[in-house]
Amino acid sequence: MVKNQLENLVSEFPQLSIRKAASAVGVSPTFVYHIFHDDMHLKPYKFHLWHKLEDKDYEKRLNFAHWFLKLPESTHEHIICSDEAYFYLTLPVNNQNNRQWSKSQPYIGTENPLHDQKILVWCAISANRVFGPYYFEDSVNQHNYLEMLKKYFWTKVLRTAEYKKYYFQQDGARPHTALTVQTWLKDKFDDKFIDKDMWPPRSPDLNPCDFYLWGHLKSMVYNPLPKTLDDLKANIEREIKKISKNILELTFLNFKNRCELIISAEGGHIEMK
């Protein structure tokens, strides 16, 4: 009888906590846990914001993983991965604290506030340093993105004496794939430019900006809570300065591990424990 009640509850409210389920049916949390885990074979999954892969993506993810793992270890520290992300003035929901009871990993999305003040931040990351931040005042397009690459990244951030040893990655966002942008980057980085044909689409689980940098920054920049966008920028810059070289090296070791897992998953999504 109690088991049936719990089955109905978790079916209707899959995000129900053990404590609330126990209170609803009048039993102990320990009893509920054993029913969920041992009898119903459920697990408390974290929310993951995954991009649904298309059929052609699997091969591209495999190809990239094999390419990366064939590189000499000494070149890994010379790979620069880049990305943009919105930072909202209001503290976002922390999905790390959310769980859903399920027999398999669910696909769940959450939304950011619709009209909240926000800034668009560009950063790049290597095993040695974080490049940026650079702030786009409006949405990014091929023109202001190329201007950023030329006037900020190239002239002020990336020392020209060093650039020939670096690989440069960007994802397939429309401003990145514009012909003018692709041509300029190929001219600067030559065969070390990881272009739109080489980088697998819908693969934030491979980009260190996505699987480390943005999440880390967003967990730190709201303490203290910013009152203005300038406060938020100052917090972002403060936290970037705190990131140690050791953390960056571990992040790129994680990058390598993820490539190995993608091969094991035959190009599919990977679950990092």
What is the predicted function of each stretch?
Residues M1-K273:
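Surface/interface recognition patches
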